[in-house]
Amino acid sequence: MNSFNEKVVLITGAGNGIGRATALAFAKQNASVVVSDINHKDGETTVSLIKEAGGTATFIPCDVSREIEVRALVDGTVEAYGKLDIAFNNAGIEIEQSKLADGDEATYDKIMDINVKGVWLCMKYQIPAMLKQSASAIVNTASIAGLGAAPKMSIYAASKHAVIGLTKSAAVEYGKKGLRVNAVCPAVIETDMFRRAAEGDPKKAEFIKSMHPVGRIGQVEEVAAAVLYLCSENAGFTTGVALPVDGGATAI
């Protein structure tokens, strides 16, 4: 894989899980990484891990559902490093566990504000900065729930379908200007969220694993590797793609 030497990378939701793993992976490839998260402690921890490994990173807190904070995040990135080459819009939430008719408006608004408006706001402010470069790339975190149905998670599924729609639209609108826009669609990945869901319930953990033809859940580093590929020169002819990282789950 190509080195990301001298590239400036902005990652939201980088305080843990997939975001942290991707921040570490970019830093290992010599990128300067702007770590962003709503949780200051988690974000600062990611920066510390990068610096301990010899990398370059800065933390800028951000609630991606707030336009003023997203604008400040992008402006702060350019102020710190002079440009923006790559963005990984990873911040998102998954809180729904009810059938559609049992859902409530507050849950709908919260999921859509972060998962959809957050990605839209990030791209709205990232794109003008990125078009100043000859080649740039955005990757948005969707989900396999954005590729089909997700029982008892209809609002979440709708939000991830929307992320894919935003991704494809941006790819078409800005492709001739050197900007590639793709999405990653993870299945179940071993994160703190998964561990909390399966804690004390071995049968549930085994059932979740069985959903994937490879017989296991994914690792955050595997999603990070997909993101780095999509942002690399090796993926120069790849844009508008929603890439499953799912152990074969969508093949069933």
Residue ranges: model-predicted function:
Residues 8, 15-17, 39:
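Conserved glycine-rich cofactor-binding loop
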Residues 94-97, 148, 228, 239-252:
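Short C-terminal tail/terminal secondary-structure segment
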Residues 98-100, 104-110, 208:
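Substrate-binding pocket helix/loop in short-chain dehydrogenase/reductase
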Residues 123, 159, 167:
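Active-site helix of classical SDR
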Residues 128, 172-176, 236:
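Alpha-helical segment proximal to the catalytic Tyr-Lys
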Residues 143:
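Residue(s) in the substrate-gating loop at a strand-loop-helix junction
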Residues 183, 206-238, 247:
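C-terminal helical subdomain
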